[in-house]
Amino acid sequence: MFQPLLDAYVESASIEKMASKSPPPLKIAVANWWGDEEIKEFKNSVLYFILSQRYTITLHQNPNEFSDLVFGNPLGSARKILSYQNAKRVFYTGENESPNFNLFDYAIGFDELDFNDRYLRMPLYYDRLHHKAESVNDTTAPYKLKDNSLYALKKPSHCFKEKHPNLCAVVNDESDPLKRGFASFVASNPNAPIRNAFYDALNSIEPVTGGGSVRNTLGYNVKNKNEFLSQYKFNLCFENTQGYGYVTEKIIDAYFSHTIPIYWGSPSVAKDFNPKSFVNVHDFKNFDEAIDYIKYLHTHKNAYLDMLYENPLNTLDGKAYFYQNLSFKKILAFFKTILENDTIYHDNPFIFCRDLNEPLVTIDDLRVNYDDLRVNYDDLRINYDDLRVNYDDLRINYDDLRVNYDDLRVNYDDLRINYDDLRVNYDDLRVNYERLLSKATPLLELSQNTTSKIYRKAYQKSLPLLRAIRRWVKKLGL
């Protein structure tokens, strides 16, 4: 149930109003970020949204220009960060990557680290909640924002229901959540063997509808993920890889879509979310046990509804909270400490015991090679799938032919036995025939001679009578 999660997030976003009407300036360099338009993507992030509540931000990508902070992540051209020597480098990731504090002064990530004031745990799901909160500032949305929240300040839109008719219906109790498809799956990265294996195992029990490029069953990729997910009782939301604390946006998408998440990725996910509100595959010894539990929920109405309507967050004294009390205040305090500290750790000669620049220069080359290998892998995978289909067809044909051969073999053996029996009978009859024929030949010869003699005597006896008849006929003139 997403509404309690939204309420808790909005509450975590509450901050005191600034005493001054003119926020201090903050120059931020974006070394590398997601997407082709890095500046634009950074402005869409929750980090920019939070910092803009306290600072007047100027963004740029010029290493020769002054920066209060420079942000970088392990994706894209990682070596760009090396060009920013005299600025405080902040690592931020949405992947299962740990920060290198020899290259970055500060870091924001998934790991549960304690590195004084240099690290903040802010999983990617917190950023996704920011986007969800923005999306429901809409008069037709089934989820409601508090009137005094930061997300309710802008003029609301009026198109949510038009784009999410099924989601609105199921959240507003206008349709039965039990009368939905079994499970959904949306993924674009095929290089996730655990996730793929679980999908195959679950799909063998009950069909799982795939709407992404991996294990797609629709014939096309869905464009509206949340509307798609809302049409199913469960959502298979495995992470690409496993890592303690590595909880991304996937579980948030399931909660938002009013479907039960089937989760795997962070073994410690129960610290972030209420274990009664989702299926945690890490809780089971193997896939079979997890699937048995999913089947139980699927077939037991009350158990399913209890989990569906659970608060996604853990509670303390009846109040929902984010793990480690994550909030806008905590994030702003983290950056306040950074800006007030003049130390640039990556430039400390005592930290550098080896040259770290040289290995980083090769990262881009390695990434190019990786992309090439990835393309080759995808091609090979397609060829493998085609060959597999052909093999399966040939196997089916072979099995059919084998069955036909076995049937013919049985029939042949039966016919052979019958033939052998008939042959024995034929030989016996032949012997009997020849024996009878040898005995009957003299009798036949005797019979023929006797018959001839009888006919001759009868003819001789009838001659006088025949002659008398002939004379009588002549007299009568006939």
UniProtKB/Swiss-Prot annotation:
This protein's UniProt keywords: Cytoplasm, Glycosyltransferase, Lipopolysaccharide biosynthesis, Membrane, Repeat, Transferase
Record-marked site positions (Important for catalytic activity): E95
Membrane topology of the entry: Peripheral membrane protein
Domain of life of the source: Bacteria
Spans annotated as May be involved in membrane binding: 434-478
One CC-aspect GO term: cytoplasm
Catalytic activity: a beta-D-galactosyl-(1->4)-N-acetyl-beta-D-glucosaminyl derivative + GDP-beta-L-fucose = a beta-D-galactosyl-(1->4)-[alpha-L-fucosyl-(1->3)]-N-acetyl-beta-D-glucosaminyl derivative + GDP + H(+)
Localization terms from the record: Membrane; Cytoplasm
EC numbers on record: 2.4.1.152
Gene Ontology molecular-function annotations: 4-galactosyl-N-acetylglucosaminide 3-alpha-L-fucosyltransferase activity; fucose binding; identical protein binding
Pathway: Lipopolysaccharide biosynthesis; LPS oligosaccharide biosynthesis
Effect ascribed to mutating E95D: Loss of alpha-(1,3)-fucosyltransferase catalytic activity
Enzyme class per UniProt: transferase
Keyword Cytoplasm carried by entry: yes
Transmembrane segments: none
SUPFAM superfamilies: UDP-Glycosyltransferase/glycogen phosphorylase
GO terms (BP aspect): fucosylation; lipopolysaccharide biosynthetic process; protein glycosylation
Family statement drawn from the similarity comment of this UniProt entry: Belongs to the glycosyltransferase 10 family.
Complexes and interactors: Homodimer.
Main function: Involved in the biosynthesis of the Lewis X (LeX) trisaccharide of the lipopolysaccharide (LPS) O-antigen. Catalyzes the addition of fucose in alpha 1-3 linkage to Gal-beta-1-4-GlcNAc-beta-O-R (LacNAc-R) type II acceptor.
Full protein name: Alpha-(1,3)-fucosyltransferase FucT
The gene coding this protein: fucT
